[in-house]
């Protein structure tokens, strides 16, 4: 049997980078090649290859800039294999902003390299569909009907997917359950606080989360209201642009950033709250999109980002309501990469969980290591994502936890896929969902 592979074409040749944003010397010159990033890097830990480590990728970025390495298939493969989890930034003693480097390299790839057909089309589908609310809602409704009919469950239980490929089965297992009514129906609403107004906040609802995590968004709004927040859900908000930033599609990311800055900034809000670590991380870094492009929006982006808060960060910083009912369960917590590494928020979720009576909390070994979700990484780099998920679930098994907690929707999907393959029943929840349950238990026992 002859295997036919479609080869991608390098369009810049061996002469360095093409037009557009490039990785800057200011950032990669900080690397002292000490190698402390290696053991922090999930792909290096799995493969043991220097070129799939942060240090190795920085070396390749420099070689392309100097014209010693073409912007071709090999370079793209190693840059694409990066999760952009930024664990290397936590480990780095020199303060290398690796995320900026790899995203700039991907901007060059996006502009100057033609990917193979299937990979290009899959990426294009995500990048074009997710920011389009109308198309996303239509697709969500179709998926909801498909899931509600029982057809999806039959397909998953049958062996039909395995006839195509194991990877297809893995990707289908990641598909989120649509939750009606969609949270998009609440866009534009104002939710009054329980008791006196302490803060006036705007809630960032996300894009996929509006369809697949409506209950999580509802729980977030309830918890904020319980803690004295008047919660406004701006109707004009849109996708945060994280997928586009991480893929180097920076022009589109700037458009999406401007949409959110306009929707939130002039509303007189104290804070902009999100329950998605990936969204919060990129929104806090909106100024980076405009620092060389648009001075007016750079200043507005700085003001916007200064008010962005993860919901766990916000609650831990205020005198949050500790009147929780008891949740008698053993729980563990997985640090989302873009909360723990990109935003350096680790203690806040644990502080909130420690306040719930009856909860037995067990630390997860290597909780800082990526679960393999990483935006759409688990779709476009499924083999590596599956390896990381397998390792993560082994660590979860060691805890004996019946509750797996995290603080990012993408991680929820990945971890739920891991749980679905196990014979042991576990729940996977966002931290704020457990807080909401604990408040509800307290109300029932009054």
PLM regions: where:
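N-terminal glycine-rich anion-binding loops that anchor highly charged ligand groups
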Residues: 36-39, 49-54, 230-233
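Iron-sulfur cluster-binding electron-transfer modules in prokaryotic oxidoreductases
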Residues: 98-446
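Non-heme iron-sulfur electron-transfer modules
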Residues: 2-20, 44-77, 95-125, 424-434
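Cysteine-centered iron-sulfur cluster-binding motifs in ferredoxin-type domains/subunits
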Residues: 24-44, 72, 76-96, 338, ...
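Generic structural signal for well-ordered, non-membrane alpha-helices
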Residues: 36-39, 59, 77, 144, ...
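Short, intrinsically disordered, charge-biased short linear motifs at domain edges
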Residues: 16-28, 68-79, 192, 225-228, ...
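Alpha-helix capping and helix-loop boundary segments enriched in small/acidic/polar residues
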Residues: 29, 48-52, 70, 244-251
């Amino acid at each position: 049997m002859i295997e036919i592979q479609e080869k991608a074409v390098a369009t810049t040749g061996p002469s360095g980078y093409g037009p557009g944003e490039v990785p800057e010397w200011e950032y990669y010159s900080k690397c002292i090649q000490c190698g402390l990033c290696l053991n922090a890097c999930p792909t290096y830990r799995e493969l043991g290859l220097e070129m799939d480590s942060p240090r190795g990728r920085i070396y390749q970025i420099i070689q392309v800039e100097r014209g010693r390495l073409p912007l071709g298939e090999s370079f793209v493969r190693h840059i694409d294999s990066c999760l952009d989890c930024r664990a290397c930034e936590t480990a780095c003693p020199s303060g290398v902003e690796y995320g900026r480097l790899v995203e700039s390299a991907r901007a060059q790839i996006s502009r100057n390299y033609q990917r193979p057909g299937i990979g290009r089309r899959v990426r294009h589908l995500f990048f074009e569909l997710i920011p389009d609310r109308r198309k996303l809602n239509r697709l969500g409704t179709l998926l909801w009907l498909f899931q509600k009919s029982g057809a999806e469950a039959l397909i998953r239980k049958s062996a039909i997917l395995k006839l195509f490929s194991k990877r297809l089965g893995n990707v289908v297992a990641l598909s989120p359950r649509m939750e009606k009514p969609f949270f998009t129906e609440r866009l534009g609403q104002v939710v009054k606080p329980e008791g006196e107004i302490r803060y006036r906040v705007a809630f960032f609802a996300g894009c996929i989360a509006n369809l697949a995590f409506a209950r999580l968004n509802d729980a977030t709004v309830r918890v904020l209201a319980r803690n004295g927040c008047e919660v406004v859900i701006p109707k004009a908000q849109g996708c945060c642009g994280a997928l586009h930033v991480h893929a180097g599609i920076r022009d589109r990311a700037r458009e999406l950033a401007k949409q959110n800055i306009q929707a939130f900034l002039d509303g007189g809000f104290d804070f902009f709250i999100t329950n998605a670590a990936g969204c919060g991380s990129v929104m806090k870094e909106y100024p980076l999109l405009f620092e060389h492009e648009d001075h007016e929006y750079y200043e507005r982006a700085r003001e916007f980002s200064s008010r962005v808060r993860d919901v766990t960060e916000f609650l831990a910083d205020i005198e949050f309501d500790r009147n929780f009912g008891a949740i008698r369960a053993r729980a563990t917590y997985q640090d989302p990469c873009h909360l723990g590494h990109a935003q350096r928020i680790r203690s806040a979720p644990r502080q909130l969980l420690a306040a719930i009576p009856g909860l037995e909390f067990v630390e997860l070994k290597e909780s800082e290591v990526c679960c393999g979700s990483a935006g759409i990484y688990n779709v476009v780099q499924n083999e590596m994502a599956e390896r990381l998920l397998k390792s993560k679930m082994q660590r979860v098994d060691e805890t004996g936890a019946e509750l797996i907690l995290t603080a990012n929707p993408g991680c929820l999907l990945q971890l739920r896929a891991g749980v679905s393959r196990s014979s042991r029943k576990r729940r996977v929840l966002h931290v704020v969902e457990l807080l909401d349950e604990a408040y509800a238990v307290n109300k029932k026992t009054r």
